Amino acid sequence: MTEEQNELNELKIAPDQTYKEFYPVSPPFSYVGIQVDDATGKKIYNAIEPTMSTEELNILKSIKDSIILNVGVPLAVLKNEKLMKDYLDQMIKKILKKNLKTVPKESVDKLNYYLIRDFLGYGKIDILFHDPNIEDISCNGTNTPLYIWHRTHESLPTNIIFPTREELNFIVTRLVYKTGNQISIANPILEGTLPEGYRAHITLDEVSKRGDTFTIRKFRTNPFTVVDLIQLGTISPKLAAYTWLLVEHSRSMMVSGAVASGKTSLLNAITMFIKPEMKVVSIEEVRELRLHENWIPLTTRPSYQPGIQEVTLFDLLKSALRQRPDYIIVGEVRGEEAYTLFQSIAVGHGGMCSIHADSEDSVIKRLITRPMDIPMMMLPLMNCLIQVKRVALGDHFGRRVESVTEITEIDKESNEPVLETRFKWNAASDTFEYFKSNNEKSVFGLISRINQIPIETLHNELERREVILKWMVDVGVKNYDDVANIIRNYYHAPDDVYNVARLGFR
């Protein structure tokens, strides 16, 4: 049996199959069915693609062989998806004409689908790349189902399996090539970015004994806006308005949470509040953030060869400080770069970052111990800690900001940071409680002192911005650019935007 027939059998679904959910991915060719075992309740993610007749499989193999043997394909064609699609279409016509075959248009369309999938895409896992409901793709080796993380159904096994090491190695080689990096027996672990912006982590069977493995972290093409997060219940309008005020006045914030808790999505949404004219430098290992035009995105570079210098987060942060940024954003702090970030905040730069930690106490412990080693007296430089977590919401899961805490000072007697809770999520009612403060050591007190703005004026401004954010939710302003434009307009004509929102105009 040919490889194509084996693959076809793996993807073929029984005609009497019933699904909990069924939706198109790339119609009319690929679909997804979420199957549920009635006995165990176990869910399976079924990737469904067109079935091929024996004749179609033979033609497909013939075309693939011809393309592989044809070493004269111009490099410009190989690098251009549109030109490559045209080239594949011509190859199909050429093979059919050569063999004097008349094939229905439906068959030609299927041949095109599989050729584009296998030569330009990612082979049998290509459907997973195109499904917008998938957040993560995990392959744990040979002869075991690929697992995905579905936005609705969470962790699911799929009906996609790599039965041989050769087949898995072929896909891994494709992934490595698309990252533009190198992997070898000497360096069997790779972190890279795919052309779509997705993060890929790959290990060879030198270190993963079940065979090569890969994990792909997908990111939304259109990132969540602050309005999206309000609608999802991750934050409240008042909480969003609070972060807006802090961003405007160049206060520092740290978003903390466990893996897949929504840290990056929240951090990216908050950055929308940065004034367009402000210069921003972001520093990440893999580029995930999206900001306005006056933005320099920096990413680390690992070294795989002697003579090629590794570029770390610490190196990039030192470089960023020489570029006179108004705001520095570090995708995730985990080492010595944390100390440099705190130093940059101390000299007046706005700063934002994320950190892996499951509570405020864990954040403090991570910051003051190796390898970050932040002196206790410097902790209040990070004005605000935002703790986000993944929570159960009835029969599904979501993300919620569990708390917003201000580090106001260091207690002189205990030498411990003094924390003030500003927002707290109530799990029973799924609402956010706001704790107003006129304390001069609070963040509003700090803004008041530095900018000579009465604290009550800041509280009033908080209410105004809450009205605007509620209005955006009510009228359905969700597009990233539309949300950004309203925020930009508010900076230039605050009364005009507020009055439109207050009166509820659409």
What are these regions (language model features)?
Residues 464-506:
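Terminal-proximal interaction/regulatory segments of ATP-powered molecular machines
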